[in-house]
Amino acid sequence: LILLMLALMPLCAFAQNGWNDALYKQIEQNVNEPVFKDKTYDVTKYGASPKATAAKNQKAINKAIEECSKKGGGKVVVPAGTYNTGAIRLKSNVNLEIQKDAKLQFVFDKTLYPIVKTRWEGMDCMNYSPCVYAYGEKNIAITGEGTIDGGGSNATWWKWCGKDRFGWTPQLEESQKIGRPLLFKLAEAGTDIEKRDMKDKGLRPQLINLYNCEGIAIKNVTLLNSPFWVIHPLLSKNILVKGVKIWNEGPNGDGCDPESCENVIIDGCTFHTGDDCIAIKSGRNRDGLKWNIPSQNIIIRNCTMEDGHGGVVIGSEISGGVKNVFAENCEMDSPNLDRVLRIKTNTCRGGVTENIYVRNITVGQCGEAVMRINLAYEPNEAAERGHIPTVRNVYMSNVTCKKSKYGVLINGLDDADEIYNIHVDNCTFDGVQDQAVKRTGKSHDIFFNNLVVNGSTVLLDPPYKHYSEWMTHSEMKRAPQSYLLDFAKKPRWSYTIGTELEPMLDTYRAYKDESILNYCKAYPDKMIAADGTITGYKYEDFNLDNCRTGHFLINLYQLYPQPSILKGMKTIFKQLENQPRTKEGVFW
């Protein structure tokens, strides 16, 4: 069995892992951590206090940020203590530092969250300000060893999601059951953003939303209980998210969702979320297609996904496309983790997702599939159809998983073949409970190289219809010269070669592959001279092993009637006629 597997391996559809080192290094060079003036603004000097009301603290913190920015920037410090507050607006050249043992505690009071321009599930709108918000700013940061708590719970923001288990009741007047379909309708109609007012419509704000900003760092803070998505950079560039700890089990509690962003590094973060850990986006349907700005040049590395629906997710709001995403050296393990790499989209979205690289990921378990590509996500979505999405150039390598339902799950479209050039290389998936690979709809050029599922090598599309062809070409690839089939360093007349070439010739007879016949011809052409002399053969040795290869010559002569082959056969037959025998008449 081991020899068989070794023989088959060269025929597996081989693919390099596709990792683009040059682009990876270019992204690293483009993402420079912001630098700030060495000047400190303590929020307590502006009236903030653990004993103050949320409204007073909000005013004080925003005043400190405003003054810091106007004076050329620096560090706005939140010292130890818990500060109730409402929405905070970050300004250019400001580093908001939440120090150790400090907590910004955002309260559930709509009056403290003014209406601002943002996006909600990929649709442009005017909605409640995110807890920390910036628009059109440069050189900004959120740092420190402290905590930002969005105050999400079943008693506050989360009940607006419209689900019983998060506190929603039919008596609740404000929830996304009202706002979400309204925003869908306005977005599909192309309504001006300023007229898409979601006040009192139940659309929860993000914890951090940095819109149209450049030069961003979010480092070392702990982020808890977001009303909605946790970190949401939007239409922004040059972003570093490093050493952040996220704990958010609320509805739609995505950890970090860069949307239509360029040059992003997410490094050394820990995610414990009620939805996707990282979800890359670029706008939904009409809005995303109108802006048509991809998320691109993103590095995800050294992260731990403790809990969440998906580890690295692309979609579903990706109408603007996604490209050049690198994920490496991460650990994932949770019964609630459904997928390691997930790409989800549909024909309302359109867009091209390409150049996705995933390597060196260790997974304890995931609920559904290690890799899931789905072009039929949310099939009942009420939006304009006909925008065919494309997913191509996806490379996964050196990923291990101890338990899942599927290894690879690909759901293409029935009427368009837009999933292709997908590579899974040197991966081991154990404990796969259903199918190693499941495909629906159309897809092509799916390549597996050394994909081992439950201890067995998996090939999606065997390169030959018949095992005999497969084995023959495997050996031809291993030893391009038939006269070296027996692993010798120089040609010799060999029992081993004869016993292997004979079934190869049978394969030619069955399937008429001329390359096999030519391969077989090469041995006698090399070994038998015109006069019938056989290289390496000695009549006087009376070695019966040398005669075994004559079987092959007899069969080959019927297809390749060369005089030299006939003379060679006669030479061997002469030995048989004179071979010493026992008294019973059989050969020694």
Task: Give the residues covered by each predicted segment.
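Sec-dependent signal peptide recognition
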Residues: 1-5
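Blade-loop segments of beta-propeller domains
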Residues: 115-117, 121, 521-556
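Low-complexity, Ser/Thr/Pro/Gly-enriched N-terminal "stalk/linker" regions
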Residues: 459-532, 562-571, 575-579, 583-584
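Extracellular "leader-to-stem" segments immediately downstream of a signal peptide or signal-anchor
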Residues: 7-95, 99-220, 228, 242-244, ...
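Right-handed parallel beta-helix
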Residues: 100-101, 138-146, 214-224, 237-248, ...
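The right-handed parallel beta-helix/beta-solenoid scaffold, focusing on the short coil/turn
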Residues: 39, 74, 81, 86, ...
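Short glycine/acidic-rich loop motifs that flank beta-strands on beta-rich extracellular proteins
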Residues: 73, 85-88, 107-109, 128-129, ...
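Extracellular beta-rich repeat passengers
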Residues: 318, 336-458
